[in-house]
């Protein structure tokens, strides 16, 4: 759909320009120019709407046909009949030698491995690492498996703040979780590496879900966070510099008294001013919106699934996995 939109916009622009050239150079009647311009614009809108309706119907049909989401990457390979590996060799990979792709987890280990494999399909990273307390059912030669202690939710947040910097040596790491991975490798921008932190932008206000916060049993109502000072951004699919992680590693996580201790909120919200004072650079929201999507795209920067490098959202995972199964075999991932 994105390719179609780009083509139609260019075609429409050239057409309107041609009409005005015809008017000025060949004396075409002014009313005729206006009529044809309006007619073609209306036709474009109508055709675009029809294509979108058709596309949504086809996606629904596809999802109905493929109800089962693969649990392991091996299952995913079997579903695709190994065609993804053939397609990968046909496409020129993006090379990011200064970025380590990594995940750190004690839960959903197979799902985290899927995120690593999909993210690295069309990108050659400096390294790819799975930091986990146990191994997945099948190991892959392009992933380095690193053993870490079992982690609960608070342990995971503490680990990302205090210890993550120890596990990579490149200038940046691309941190992914089970519900986030690269979806459009060709939308990588070199500007991403100019910043110490970039993640999907949040809304200006966040009503926290008590089941997802890093500090269970919070007294009183869950706060509404005002993110207007900095809305960048979601940690579940984020690019972080080694400088940033060395800086936050000096923080004693257990001593922090904030009501919510999710690591991305600590870095990007509660400790934002401290980070800025230490020379940490956060990507501007408009660039972050090109990096990843996490919230409802209708409310943030006109994002859609074809306009971002990656995503992070539990409610989007099944959709993107099905899109991957549909698009990867024909070289569209």
Question: Language-model segments: what does each one mean?
Answer:
Residues 46-64:
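Transmembrane-cytosolic junction motif
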Residues 32-35, 50, 65-172:
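N-terminal anchoring/stem segment of glycosyltransferases
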Residues 212-228, 244:
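Short, flexible, basic/aromatic active-site loop/helix in glycosyltransferases
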Residues 226-333:
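Catalytic core and acceptor-binding pocket of nucleotide-sugar-dependent glycosyltransferases
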Residues 170-181:
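Short beta-strand-to-loop acidic/aromatic patch adjacent to the donor-nucleotide binding site
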Residues 128, 178-179, 241:
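Generic structural signal for small/hydrophobic residues in well-ordered secondary structure
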Residues 22-35:
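Membrane-interfacial hairpin junctions
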Residues 184-219:
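Conserved donor-nucleotide/metal-binding helix-loop-beta segment in metal-dependent transferases, i.e.
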């Amino acid at each position: 759909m994105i390719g179609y939109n780009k083509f139609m916009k260019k075609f429409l622009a050239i057409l309107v320009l041609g009409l005005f050239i015809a008017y000025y150079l060949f004396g075409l009647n002014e009313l005729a120019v206006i009529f044809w311009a309006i007619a073609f614009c209306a036709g474009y809108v109508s055709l675009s709407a029809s294509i979108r309706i058709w596309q949504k119907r086809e996606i629904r049909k596809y999802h109905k046909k493929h109800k089962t989401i693969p649990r392991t990457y091996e299952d995913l390979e079997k579903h695709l009949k190994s065609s993804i590996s053939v397609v990968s060799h046909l496409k020129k990979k993006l090379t990011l030698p200064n970025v380590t792709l990594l995940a750190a987890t004690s839960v959903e280990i197979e799902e985290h491995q899927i995120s690593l494999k999909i993210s690295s399909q069309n990108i050659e990273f400096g390294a790819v690492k799975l930091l986990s307390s146990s191994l997945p059912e099948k190991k892959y030669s392009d992933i380095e498996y690193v053993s870490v202690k079992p982690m609960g939710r608070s342990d995971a947040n503490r680990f990302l703040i205090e210890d993550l910097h120890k596990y990579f040596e490149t200038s940046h790491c691309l941190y992914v979780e089970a519900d986030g991975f690269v979806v459009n490798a060709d939308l990588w921008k070199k500007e991403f590496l100019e910043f110490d932190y970039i993640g999907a932008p949040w809304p200006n206000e966040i009503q926290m879900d008590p089941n997802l916060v890093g500090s269970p049993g919070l007294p009183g109502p869950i706060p509404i966070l005002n993110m207007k000072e900095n809305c960048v951004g979601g940690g579940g699919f984020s690019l972080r510099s080694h400088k940033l992680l060395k800086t936050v590693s000096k923080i004693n996580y257990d001593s922090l008294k904030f009501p919510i201790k999710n690591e991305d909120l600590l870095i990007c919200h509660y400790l934002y001013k401290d980070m800025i004072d230490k020379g940490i650079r956060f990507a501007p929201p408009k660039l972050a919106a090109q990096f990843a999507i996490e919230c409802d795209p209708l409310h943030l920067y006109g994002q859609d699934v074809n306009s971002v490098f990656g995503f992070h959202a539990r409610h989007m995972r099944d959709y993107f996995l099905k899109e991957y199964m549909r698009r990867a075999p024909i070289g569209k991932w």
